[in-house]
From Swiss-Prot:
Protein name (Swiss-Prot/TrEMBL): Threonine--tRNA ligase
Native organism taxonomy: Bacteria, Pseudomonadati, Pseudomonadota, Alphaproteobacteria, Hyphomicrobiales
EC number: 6.1.1.3
Organism the protein comes from: Brucella abortus (strain 2308)
EC category name: ligase
GO MF terms held by the record: ATP binding; metal ion binding; threonine-tRNA ligase activity; tRNA binding
Length: 658
């Protein structure tokens, strides 16, 4: 083995170093200021401890706090400090696992008395003391026997179980920070002092060990950490905004929907909420029709044999709702399942009747009700449910048509998002996973086509970010994932485009090619909203309940100041309704400020106020949600203006084009 390694620097230059040299020494050899800023280093993208020897040649990167990758290290190290603080303050508490998660970290603890929110300030204070000690992170590699013995002697039974679960031949790494240590894969920064003070413990929750309800209940402490105070405060402000916009609270205030114990994870839509849902369906239906889709509908309940053929029974059975019918009146004991997906049903429709290459592409769309079992702890309002509606579509095409169809789908997806005000979109290509069906040659062709499509999208759209997710594709083909950013900076993965060579083959779907031979079609799975319930939840939070006029379930309230205006208010409401607007009248004997405040809480976009004077002059006072201003105008002028504003964006484009 060579004693030297060749390292390529970011500027392209290549230098040789002794293989035993550490990352810290290398950083110092470049400059002392860089050595002070360094928190880790990477070779060929693999992040390593500064104390690790270089070992191998490759592309070198010195990671500082400003590097996005440093954030994971900061959060990882903070989780370790949290665990040390807890054990200092509460002797006898067992530590289990403490991973980095999106926007922060958590650590699970086993303790007879669960932690409460009141404990968090005390723990935070101790954490800051530990960080101030600036103890170095040092790594040791232990034998399995030593690790089990040490943790067993400390009464850490969960750590012993974790040691047992580590595959044979894999190093057992132990990281020290002063005298305290933990089992960990690493990497870590150089010392606790590099963490800084830009962290906060957020909440406590219960969590079963290994996520299994048969195991003991642990206490999970969640926290977050950032590289600086500005980022931390921005995140905390975003959380405050998110709480104000929580669709569950707004759903109650706006009287849109509710959930109840008898139907966990399924939505009870109220009249206003269902109107909003239907607005979304109507909009999507028009968009699909204009893009050549045929809307279909497939059964909710199907025999398990179909799911066995599709592969869902083997891959997805535990997440499916099974249906059996037993009793004297039944003549069989067949097992059925509520459909978790619409795709097998669409293949059946494609197979019904002979198809020619001249018929392709065939685009089948469905607003399909599907059911998937989700653990009760994972359910979250409209965002995570057990029963939902997919805006599902499947395009059956030739391999040669695949690129053009993916581009057509992309144009439609981006157009829909833009109509709802989402301009910042990220598209990522997920490539072949380790477990997959189909030959490498087939995957090569599919990924090549989708890489070309992604490049075309990147060139056509300056505001679209793109990326690659290696190994994250579906088992049957590569896919695009569309992520949109909302009004407060949160990202939501919604749309997907997935290429599938597997399902048509499983079901024996074919078309007759130009050579009169049977050919297997490519099947492209496509969703824009994904779950329409979830998309509505995203919209409610994005707009904080203040929906665009064209989408609002109640667009206008006609409210009276005095009973002298009741008849005029009814007349005005009738004209507004005749013009196609969603209108409610409020003739109650209440003060107008009370009425305005109440309808504002329900996020009604426009309130038309009528008093005796307005009734005599055939005018209205228009008030907009979120504004204290009011504008007087004739009723006809108000109708004309509101009808223009209430025209859905797709219909407005058609109107303007005409």
């Amino acid at each position: 083995m060579s004693n030297t390694v060749s390292l390529q620097f970011p500027d392209g230059s290549v230098r040789e170093y002794d293989a035993s040299m550490t990352g810290a020494a290398l950083a110092e050899s470049i400059s002392k200021s860089l050595a002070k800023k360094a928190v880790a280093y990477a070779v060929d993208g693999t992040v390593r401890d500064l104390s690790d020897p270089l070992g191998a040649s490759g592309k070198l990167e010195i990671i500082t706090r400003e590097d996005p990758r440093a954030l994971e290290l900061i959060r990882h190290d903070t989780a370790h400090v949290l665990a040390e603080a807890v054990q200092e303050l509460f002797p006898g508490t067992q530590v289990t696992i403490g991973p980095v998660i999106e926007n922060g970290f958590y650590y699970d603890f086993a303790r007879n008395e669960p932690f409460t929110l009141d404990d968090l300030p005390v723990i935070e204070k101790k954490m800051r003391e530990i960080i101030q000690r600036n103890k170095p992170f040092t790594k040791e590699v232990w034998s399995r026997e030593k690790a089990k013995q040490v943790f067993s002697d400390k009464g850490e039974s969960y750590k012993v179980e974790l040691v047992d679960a580590i595959p044979a031949g894999q190093d057992l790494k132990i990281y020290y920070q002063g005298d305290w240590f933990d089992l960990c894969r690493g990497p870590h920064m150089a010392s606790t002092g590099q963490i800084g003070n830009s962290f906060k413990l957020m909440k406590v929750a219960g969590a079963y060990w290994r996520g299994d309800a048969n195991n003991p209940m642990l206490t999970r402490i969640y926290g977050t950490a950032f590289a600086n105070d500005n980022d931390l405060q921005a995140y905390l402000h975003m959380l405050e905004e998110a709480e104000k916009r929580d669709h569950r609270r707004l759903g109650r205030e706006m009287d849109l929907f509710h959930f109840q114990e008898e139907g966990p994870g399924v939505v009870f839509w109220h009249a206003k909420g269902w109107k909003m849902f239907q607005n979304l369906v109507s909009y999507m239906r028009r968009r699909l029709d204009s893009h050549g889709y045929q809307e279909v509908n497939t059964p909710q309940v199907l025999d398990k044999s179909l799911w066995e053929t599709s592969g869902h029974w083997g891959w997805y059975r535990d997440n499916m709702f099974k249906v059996t019918v037993a009793g004297d009146d039944t003549d069989d004991d067949r097992v059925f399942a509520l459909k978790p997906m619409n795709c097998p049903g669409h293949v059946q429709i494609f197979k019904h009747g002979l198809k020619s290459y001249r018929d392709l592409p065939i685009k089948l769309a469905e607003f399909g009700n599907v059911h998937r079992y989700e653990p009760s702890g994972a359910l979250h309002g409209l965002m995570r449910v057990r029963g939902f509606t997919q805006d599902d579509a499947h395009i059956f095409c030739t391999e040669e048509q695949m690129a053009a169809e993916c581009l057509h789908i992309n144009d439609l997806i981006l157009s829909v998002y833009k109509d709802f005000g989402f301009e910042e979109i990220t598209i990522k290509l997920s490539t072949r996973p380790e477990k997959r069906v189909g030959s490498d040659e087939l995957w090569d062709r599919a990924e090549s086509v989708m890489m070309t499509v992604l490049e075309q999208i990147r060139q056509q759209s300056n505001n679209i970010k793109t990326g690659i997710l290696p190994g994250e594709g579906a088992f049957y083909g590569p896919k695009f994932e569309y992520t949109l950013k909302d009004a407060i900076g949160r990202e939501w993965q919604c749309g997907t485009t997935q290429v599938d060579f597997n399902l048509p083959e499983r079901f024996g779907a074919f078309y007759i090619g130009a050579d009169s031979e049977k050919k297997q079609p490519v099947m492209i799975h496509r969703a824009i909203c994904g779950s329409m319930e979830r998309f509505l939840g995203i919209l409610i939070e994005n707009f904080a309940g203040h929906m665009p006029l064209w989408f609002a379930p109640v667009q206008v309230v006609v409210a009276t100041i005095t009973s002298d205006a009741d008849e005029y208010a009814k007349e005005a409401a009738a004209k507004l309704k005749a013009a196609g607007l969603q209108v409610v009248t409020d003739l109650r004997n209440e003060k107008i400020n009370y009425k305005v405040r109440e309808h504002s809480l329900q996020k009604v976009p426009v309130i038309l106020v009528c008093g005796k004077r307005e009734a005599e002059e055939k005018t209205v006072n228009m008030r907009r949600l979120g504004s204290r201003d009011q504008e007087s105008m004739t009723l006809d002028e108000a109708i004309a203006r509101l009808c223009e504003e209430a025209t859905p964006p797709d219909l407005l484009r058609l109107k303007n084009a005409g």
